[in-house]
């Protein structure tokens, strides 16, 4: 009976430690890859501005609004680039 209880507690402890280590590894990988948050915010702002200005210029020229293609997982919707 004691051996079974010790085995169960050991497995639970290993599971908790493994889960914690996996979460920490994932967080560290996310922080290392890509751009800092401030640069991402600037890129997002540029994409929104870029798409809406493109459509407004085309409308003023009495042409149909051909939405500017957004790249890298973004699409133009309601004159704005939105993440797909």
From Swiss-Prot:
Cellular-component GO terms for this entry: extracellular region; host cell postsynaptic membrane
Tissue specificity: Expressed by the venom gland.
Domain of life: Eukaryota
Keyword Secreted assigned: yes
Record's signal peptide: 1-22
Keywords assigned by UniProt, alphabetized: Disulfide bond, Neurotoxin, Postsynaptic neurotoxin, Secreted, Signal, Toxin
MF-aspect GO terms: toxin activity
Disulfide bonds: 51-65, 55-76, 70-81
Residues making up the propeptide: 23-47
Compartment(s): Secreted
Family, per entry: Belongs to the neurotoxin 12 (Hwtx-2) family. 02 (Hwtx-2) subfamily.
Function: Postsynaptic neurotoxin.
The protein's name: U4-theraphotoxin-Hhn1a
Organism whose genome encodes this protein: Cyriopagopus hainanus (Chinese bird spider)
């Amino acid at each position: 009976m004691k051996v079974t209880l010790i085995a169960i507690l050991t497995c639970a402890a290993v599971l908790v430690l493994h889960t914690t280590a996996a979460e920490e590894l994932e967080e560290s990988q996310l922080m290392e890859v890509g751009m800092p948050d401030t640069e991402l915010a600037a890129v997002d702002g540029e994409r929104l501005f870029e798409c809406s200005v493109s459509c407004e210029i085309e409308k003023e020229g009495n042409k149909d609004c051909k939405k500017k293609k957004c790249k890298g997982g973004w699409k133009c919707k309601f004159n704005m680039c939105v993440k797909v």
